[in-house]
């Protein structure tokens, strides 16, 4: 998913609510990169930064997250959750489902673990 596809999916998940668009549109890229950073940290232990070669922040509409394809939808879910979290109680309840979906993928990425979370196996713990 590219950044523009992620933006389009967020608009779809928020029901294209024009009334709220002005409130969250300036922050939507920050929300996306925040979710991306959480997933990258769970997967590799690194953080998303603007000058990173492996995990740069998503800025251009053609940028793609450098994570497994199945996790891209979780970035959308996290951004949608952040949009809904400051709304009325109905919107907050709606946002919880998106956070739960995000968290499931976060746990899966952490378990899958790129380099940081791989299970360790000791062949011999005693020195001869």
Describe each region flagged by the PLM.
Residues 88-98:
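Short conserved catalytic/interaction loops centered on acidic-Pro-aromatic/His motifs
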Residues 1-64, 107-128:
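Conserved short "hinge" loops at termini or chain/domain junctions
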Residues 69-78:
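Elongated alpha-helical scaffolds
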Residues 7, 29, 76, 96-99:
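Extracytoplasmic/secreted envelope proteins and their assembly/folding machinery
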Residues 25, 65-69, 88:
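Short, charged/polar micro-motifs that form catalytic or ligand-binding hotspots
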Residues 80-87:
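Extended, well-ordered alpha-helical segments in internal regulatory regions
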């Amino acid at each position: 998913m590219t950044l523009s596809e992620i933006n389009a999916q967020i608009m779809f998940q928020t029901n294209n609510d024009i009334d709220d668009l002005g409130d969250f549109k300036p922050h939507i890229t920050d929300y996306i990169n925040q979710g991306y950073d959480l997933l990258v940290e769970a997967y590799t232990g690194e953080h998303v930064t603007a000058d990173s070669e492996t995990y740069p922040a998503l800025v251009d509409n053609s940028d793609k997250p450098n994570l497994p394809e199945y996790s891209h939808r979780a970035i959308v879910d996290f951004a949608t959750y952040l949009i809904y979290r400051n709304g009325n109680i109905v919107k907050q309840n709606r946002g919880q489902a998106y956070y739960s979906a995000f968290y499931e993928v976060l746990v899966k990425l952490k378990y899958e673990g790129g380099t940081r979370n791989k299970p360790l196996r000791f062949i011999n713990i005693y020195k001869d």
